Swiss-Prot record:
This protein's encoding gene: hisE
Keyword annotations: Amino-acid biosynthesis, ATP-binding, Cytoplasm, Histidine biosynthesis, Hydrolase, Nucleotide-binding
Substrates-to-products reaction catalysed: 1-(5-phospho-beta-D-ribosyl)-ATP + H2O = 1-(5-phospho-beta-D-ribosyl)-5'-AMP + diphosphate + H(+)
Molecular functions per Gene Ontology: ATP binding; phosphoribosyl-ATP diphosphatase activity
GO cellular component: cytoplasm
Protein name listed in UniProt: Phosphoribosyl-ATP pyrophosphatase
Pathway given in the UniProt record: Amino-acid biosynthesis; L-histidine biosynthesis; L-histidine from 5-phospho-alpha-D-ribose 1-diphosphate: step 2/9
Length: 87
């Protein structure tokens, strides 16, 4: 099972090594605007899942939201510690 930290490490590695066919690399290359739209999309889907689709579907949507948030962090050179200090 992945954790927030292990996912961030995996995505950071992909950003550095840029494996061919990586959806993470593709998203990073599309830029902040694209990533931001994905975050908004997944936030809405998380909300709808929480309202109407139950806990498992909500958790799935939240995992996708966290993925895109981490891609945005990497795009802008933020670390987990940069975010944690604001919690």
């Amino acid at each position: 099972m992945k954790t927030f930290e292990s996912l961030f490490a995996e995505l950071s590695e992909k950003a550095q090594t840029r494996p061919e066919g990586s959806l993470t690399v593709d998203e990073l290359d599309k830029g902040t605007h694209f990533i931001g739209k994905k975050i908004i999309e997944e936030a809405g889907e998380t909300w709808m899942a929480a309202e109407y689709e139950g806990a498992d579907r909500t958790a799935e949507e939240m995992s996708q939201l966290l993925y895109h948030v981490q891609v945005m962090m990497i795009k802008h050179g933020l670390t987990l510690e940069d975010v944690y200090k604001h919690l």
